[in-house]
Amino acid sequence: LIRGKRKITLTEDGIILRKRAEEILSLVEKTESDLISNTPLISGEITIGGNPTITVLNTAARLRSKYPDVHFQFYSSDAIDVLERLEHGSLDFAVFLEPIDVAEYDYLPLPESSCWGLLMPSGCELAKKDYVDKTDLLETPLIFHRRVGLQQLISHWADTAIKDFNIAATYNVINGSPTKFIKSRLGFYLTTEDLLPAVLEPDVCFRPLNPPLEIQYALIWKRTALQSKAAEMFLQELKQSVT
């Protein structure tokens, strides 16, 4: 603890300890829920991290209609935090954009996919084009996700090392609309189209990459995890809906 004149704040180590304590409490609560869900009556809580797709949500609704004592908790955070919680067992599943680390996780491809492109000011020169090519991307200051796997995906598409891109800023999770970044003129926002609002503000526009770069969502879970009966039923229901 750091004691000030009027308040006490946590040190960096204290912040880490608090985060670990929160994870432990979450894991204890989940373990209690799992023990309940392994009774003959299917019940308990299923925890899902990341950005749930409509397929995942529809499956959750169907499972709830069959087993009303099953409940869901959705947890939104950056990829590192979600993977840590998946690793520690406080999450059953996570919804991620591919690529997936298949050495550590089992996964189920989901039908939802999206295309990569740039969010930009409507009045800029690049907005006059129907698409964004490699040359455009390399000449443009970018605001890009910090997840290494996604950066490698773009690097492979452009056949260019990520260090050679003009990356003005990176982010992990965006709260609210990303258009504020465009209006600030910090850079152009490299993202997938499905993460944008259904209706964009008139002074911004989205242009897809060319050649097109589509990416698919997947549900992932820890390969060695011991799943509750409720989680097993959810996964079974989801597999039936996507096959």
Specify the residue positions occupied by each region the protein language model found.
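Alpha-helical linker/hinge and terminal dimerization helices associated
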Residues: 17-39
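Flexible hinge/capping segments at coil-to-helix
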Residues: 40, 107-116, 120-142, 146
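Short amphipathic alpha-helical coupling segments at ligand-binding clamshell hinges
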Residues: 13, 17-20, 59, 153-154, ...
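Beta-alpha-beta core module
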Residues: 102-109, 113-115, 176-224
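A short LG(V/I)-centered, amphipathic sequence patch enriched
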Residues: 1-10
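Secondary-structure junction motif
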Residues: 140-163, 227-235
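Interdomain hinge and pocket-entrance segments immediately C-terminal to HTH DNA-binding domains
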Residues: 36-55, 66-70, 114-115
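Hydrophobic hinge/microswitch elements
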Residues: 78-91, 96-97, 148-205
